[in-house]
């Protein structure tokens, strides 16, 4: 289920930790790169500052056709500028079927999430749930 959701250009919610310890969530585009996940952000955004200070994140994806199925990926991130514009173009084509409209003042970053834990859930309410006969 995890690879299927990631390969289907499913919107995801990225949770980071604010400086005061409170959670901060952002809807993001994501793609798989082997066992790691790539996202794009802009230098100066709150999530960017949060990840620079504390690289621990959680990413949640759910199946729009069956929201009772979801995947949570926990791990740490690193961010680099190299390839930032190329990644947002690739993600924009996957999610919007067109290239990204770049703004010269924006510095794009590649966010690479290295998973430490992956949690998959299928609720008993899901049409995909297969119960046990016991």
Briefly describe each language-model feature range:
Residues 1-11, 127-134:
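Extreme N-terminal tail/first-helix region
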Residues 2, 10, 35, 69, ...:
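A generic secondary-structure signal marking the coil-to-beta-strand transition
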Residues 5-6, 51, 91, 113:
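A generic structural signal for nonpolar/aromatic side chains embedded in well-ordered alpha-helices
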Residues 9-43, 51, 57-61, 70-72:
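Short beta-strand segments
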Residues 42, 63-64, 115-116:
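Short secondary-structure boundary segments
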Residues 50, 54, 124-125:
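Residue-level signal for well-ordered alpha-helical positions
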Residues 68-134:
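Charged, gly/pro-rich active-site loop segments
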């Amino acid at each position: 289920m995890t690879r299927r959701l990631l390969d289907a250009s499913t919107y995801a919610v990225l949770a980071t930790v604010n400086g005061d310890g409170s959670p901060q969530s952002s809807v993001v585009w994501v793609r798989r790169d082997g066992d790691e996940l790539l996202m794009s952000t802009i230098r100066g955004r709150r999530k960017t500052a949060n990840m620079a200070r504390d690289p621990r994140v959680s990413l949640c994806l759910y199946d729009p056709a069956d929201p009772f199925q979801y995947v949570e990926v926990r791990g740490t991130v690193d961010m680099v500028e190299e390839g930032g514009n190329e990644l947002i173009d690739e993600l924009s084509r996957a999610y919007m079927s067109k290239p990204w409209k770049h703004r010269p003042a924006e510095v794009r970053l590649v966010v690479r999430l290295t998973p430490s834990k992956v949690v998959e859930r299928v609720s008993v309410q899901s049409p995909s749930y297969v119960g046990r006969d016991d």
